[in-house]
Amino acid sequence: MERRPTASFEPMNDPDPRWVETTRAVQRDLDRSAAYQLAVREAELEDIMKGRLEAPPPTQYGWGKGMLGVQDGGGAIMDAQLVDATVEDVTQHIREATKCRHPAQTDTQGGDKEGDFKARVTRELRAAVEFSTGHEDMKGEFARRSAVQQRIAASLADLSSELRAKYSPQHVRCAYFEPINVAYVAAMTNALRLPDTDLAMRLLLGAKVAGDLPATKAWDARFKPGSLGMRFEDLPHGQWNEWLHGDIERRATRSGQARETAEIIRARTASEIDAGLSDGYWEKEDLDERYGVNGWRALRRFAVPQADKIRVCDDAKESLVNAGSNTRDKLRLVEADFPARMAKLYAEAIGESSGGLDLIHGTEDIAAAYRKVPSDSMAFTTIAMYNTRALPRPGEEPNGQGFCPRVQYVQMPGMPFGLTSSVTTFCSAATFAAHCARRLLAATTEGFVDDFSIVGMAAWDDAPQRAMVKLMRAIGLPFSGEKHERMAPINVFCGVISDFTRLRKEGIVMVYVSQKRKNKLRIDLERARSGLTPKAARRLVGKLGFTLCWSFGRVGRAALQPLQARADSDADESFVDWALLRSINFLSAIVARLPRRTIKVEHDAEGRMPICVWSDARYEADAEDPAEGGFIIYVPGEDGEEDEWIACTHVTPTEVVGAWEYRKQYIGQLEILYAVAPYFTVPEVFAGREVLHFIDNTSACAALIKGYSRAIDSGLIVNAFHAFNVGIQADVWFEYVRSKANIADFPSRDAWEELWQAFESVGVDNRKVRWVECELPPIFSLQAPAHAWIGAAEARLERASRTTGRTTGSRSDSARQRPELKRRPRRVCRAGRQRHVLRSALGARRALSRVRRIRWVATRADPKGGGCGKRRATGTALRLSPGGEGRVEHRTGASHQGPHAQHPSQRTHGTVHS
């Protein structure tokens, strides 16, 4: 086997000359060590990849970039589409689209353009799965491999101590926490040919804290300059320290609550000092004397309340340490659905002969992780805090408890929580540990900062987890026993539950957030009713975004618009207006009934091809019918049956456009409206199926993928679609198609000759195309709660199943004859079929008044006060029973709240009683 040069370290770009000199000296010591050379050779023999760096199998870009089973908006629209975005011929597009497999069937790990690091991790995980599933006694093999690594690490312990005593700065040598085995890190980096060749030196000499940070090379390269606009070294550190000292003292003594917070910070800091993670207490004068007035810069320590504890953080943003730091790494962290991804890899490796996949997974955590990787100088890891129990200095009069409270300082040999450099420094060490576990233990594991997930077969019990625990202890980054979660079918990783209980029999992994997290989120939403500041809104949006993304589809994301607007506001306001309260009510209902995300591990055993949908819309204000739309559906045949084609053309009811905010152009809203129309029209066709949906409008495509749109009108439609889709469980992949290649462009603009020719060009008998009556989402019920849409979808599917006697998701038995050539298909508007000319804002209002026959109805004042005016119009509405089950009905009298409507808090939310 070809050997790599023995050098384990490479100088940084424009490095410190002392760093280069020390690196060469350390390398000479390693080369002279027989134990080091033997460790490298043993590790090369244990490597399951044997140094191979072959390219991974191709994957579909855009699928699973953020989460498994979730389409990525950026990559899906233009990057490496299933059907090339440059196709301009309808026939060519249909032929290519109907041959495509759904990305969920072709992708396992989640393809995305993340460069060499992602490819390396994918290869390692795949190799670990293939090795472990092909071994006869993997439980014993984990124990053997773990013992080998422990022996190698023990053989290098003395060498690590010698290197540390000879080269490490004093604060690293004197640190009380367990040191990392740098000789072992250097040997494994060499043996496995890992790109982060400077890791051992950073752990030996300490990592740079601020300024121009060198690239770690643990991930792909990306230069990100600091926002400071000047060199960090040129900042007036002395002036900052003077101001911060006085400001901390003023804040700590201004109220009783501030003094209580200061006591909490002191207690947490004291526990770190007792654990040997910090050194203190120091006076400002001591540090000025040690480093010089401008030679150090302090960070303010503050308290952050969490679920069951108070965490202390150090404000590197306020002190401009982060703003003054340039980074050169594109940090990549695993997603919380890692266990589900591994389930797909195991299913792929085992295949149909397995007779069922039985997996378990566990989690581990490194306590005080950042504190255990050394910094190069404590001058910039100095923490300022108000010590409520500071001992009196000579000449000072103590208080009644014998203390003289004042500002004091604590120094850390490791990295503080809050620094940009802390994240890259520690994560590079954690990434190294994950590489070793995958290649030397054959464990399928990955880490999110200091949290690690380990997945394995149930037959192995917790053998891979025990091997991982021993490996981390050998490296010098031991896991915390208090946060150990033994491998089991159900476990939590990064706040998300991965449930394997249905994996063996059904091939399904369920991913969802815990009920405890949802309950806390509902409490936060309830508190927001009384007032919501921009800072609180930012925290709430972050929590909601995380929670909603782990439910099925993108349900609820559009309802975040008012909260996001408050979060982005620069004004100091907390008043909860009607839009905010409506959003809070909607999100509270969603969180209470949040559907779980289900991920198919073995896709479509029957080999069913996906359904294809093309949709389009048109808006011309001066036309006889200003707004029109249509869609074409292709349902591939099964069991020898013929393929089915479904078509629809539709004149948009005037009240639909009139219900939206006035603008000169409505094409964006209409494209979204007619993109979701197929699923409301024939939901039984899409139930439980994989779908490829082509749209010739990039903004509509992006909105449907992300589940969010800045335009309120569009956002309501998108939100209704994703909620409705929870009920029908369609796995929809949206993709862009050029207008010239979109067959749905023909029915939306009355181009019947072109439509018949397009059908005939792909061998479709026009007479067998089934024309359906378009059913739009009820425009006057778009603000209904999510569970109402879910109930409406389930009711529609149940009704369709009773009517046809067939399971949903299957083909229909009936097919309508096509209209005669050149004859326009019957286009029905359930809310009334009138034609109107919308030429101006005034004309639109007058036309709308004539169609709707608007009349104001005086209503009795609400018992709680405040009258309410209503206007009634012909339209559609979502009818809800008191129990929350909904059904879509078309009726006269869909109500809108008039300009004198009372505040939402004075009305009942969530249901419209039948």
Positions of predicted regions on the chain:
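A short, polar/acidic, helix/strand-boundary loop motif
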Residues: 404-432, 634-673, 699, 708, ...
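RNase H catalytic domain
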Residues: 446, 680-742, 749, 913-914
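Polymerase palm active-site segment centered on the conserved acidic dipeptide of motif C
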Residues: 339-344, 363, 444-446, 454-523, ...
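Catalytic-core region of right-hand nucleic acid polymerases
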Residues: 257-260, 264, 269, 273-427, ...
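Intrinsically disordered, low-complexity regulatory segments at domain boundaries
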Residues: 2-357, 373, 473-478
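C-terminal reverse transcriptase regions that engage the nucleic-acid substrate
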Residues: 488-602, 745, 824, 833-847
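Active-site palm subdomain of RNA-directed nucleic acid polymerases
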Residues: 423-468, 678-695, 914
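Catalytic palm active-site di-aspartate
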Residues: 363-367, 416-418, 440-458, 489-497, ...
